Amino acid sequence: MLVAAYAALMAVESLVLDPLAAVPGATLEEIHAYLTAAGDDVPSDIAWVIATASIGVVLAAATAIVGVWRRLSLSTLAIVFLAIVAAGAVPAFLDGFRLNMDIADTYGVSGGAHTVWAGVLYLTSLAAFGAIIGLGVYKLHRRAKMTTLA
């Protein structure tokens, strides 16, 4: 669920929120039309963002299936799901080089993030990385405790 929410926010931020913030007062249709008239391939940019957002969801679904099939522990599954979210910072950053850079070049605005939502994605990835470390320490502590009891 967290992976799907992250992917959805990543796509909405890249495709809707950031373009609207970069060009205040314009609609998405107007932005896309202006970019297309300038020679940018907007459908390709949109497809790229959707594809990169979908990769995490597919990885999470595959992890769930393999986890049930191989009877992986909940903590192991949590670590893998958190790793997918932590790694999401990379495609979230790279998505900015498609549509957002076209907007920056065409409209003469900054190519950086124009909303706080990119930061939310990065901080979520950072928190997921921290949670991986915490779960790893927990698993090691638990394993050591079980070994001393045996």
Question: Where in the sequence are the language-model features?
Answer:
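Membrane-interfacial loop-to-transmembrane-helix junctions in polytopic alpha-helical membrane proteins
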Residues: 37-44, 72, 110-120
